[in-house]
């Protein structure tokens, strides 16, 4: 199974089924691919309604007849646009044909900007994905939260954590999160897309590895095998 970081918070999982998380491709200044470069996508996971995460979900879903997995409010919004959806809520889990997905808490917003209006997008979340015997945690956009301690029992293989500050955890809080989660590997995300969320990723790697957690820095387009 290949897991590819496509910049910002976009993660592509290629296995028996292909899954993309927070598909912000168009307009993403650090994404190295275009929509037409993506493989066939079976499922799209959306952590919250902000444009840099909801991204190109509608176009990708319609092109591939893919199913969007997100909270009820986002799924309702997308369903009105003719998209296939599977609605969940925080704490809920479901066994799909590729594996199990559990929605985890996140501390953030989730409004959907639609023209001049901001539509209620439910609660933001992360995802704990169990697939082909491996566990992947994608935190979404979030501040540090005590609920992350519960993930230590999950034996997470790789955790994608935001480190860019301002809207999400900064380096120091992301290190604390990694210590609580205890993943085998941590991959930093949601940094450097714009100047406002610049972070010293090498400092994060140094500090988190001092705490005993292996850090893998993936440049946009780079992958790891699980």
Swiss-Prot record:
Protein's UniProt keywords contain Hydrolase: yes
Superkingdom per UniProt: Bacteria
Keywords: Hydrolase
SUPFAM superfamilies: Metallo-hydrolase/oxidoreductase
InterPro entries (UniProt xref): Metallo-B-lactamas, RibonucZ/Hydroxyglut_hydro, UPF0173, UPF0173_UPF0282_UlaG_hydrolase
Tagged with keyword Hydrolase: yes
MF terms in GO: hydrolase activity
Recorded family membership: Belongs to the UPF0173 family.
The name this protein goes by in its record: UPF0173 metal-dependent hydrolase TRQ2_1653
């Amino acid at each position: 199974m290949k897991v590819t970081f496509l910049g910002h918070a976009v993660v592509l999982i290629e296995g028996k089924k292909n899954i993309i998380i927070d598909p912000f491709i168009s307009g993403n200044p650090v994404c190295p691919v275009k929509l037409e470069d993506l493989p066939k996508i079976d499922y799209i996971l959306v952590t919250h309604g902000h444009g840099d995460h909801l991204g190109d979900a509608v176009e990708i879903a319609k092109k591939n007849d893919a199913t969007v997995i997100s909270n009820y409010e986002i799924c309702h919004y997308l369903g009105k646009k003719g998209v296939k959806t599977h609605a969940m809520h925080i704490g809920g889990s479901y066994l799909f044909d590729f594996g199990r997905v559990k929605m985890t808490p996140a501390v953030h917003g989730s409004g959907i900007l639609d023209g001049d209006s901001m539509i209620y997008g439910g609660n933001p979340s992360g995802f704990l994905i169990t697939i082909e015997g491996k566990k992947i945690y994608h935190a979404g956009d979030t501040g540090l939260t005590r609920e992350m301690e519960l993930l230590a029992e999950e034996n997470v293989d790789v955790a994608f954590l935001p480190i860019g500050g301002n809207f999400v955890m900064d380096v120091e809080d992301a290190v604390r999160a990694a210590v609580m989660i205890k993943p085998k590997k941590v991959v930093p995300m949601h940094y450097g897309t714009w100047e406002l969320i610049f972070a010293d990723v090498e400092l994060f790697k140094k500090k988190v590895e001092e705490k005993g957690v292996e850090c893998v820095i993936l440049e946009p387009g780079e992958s790891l095998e699980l």
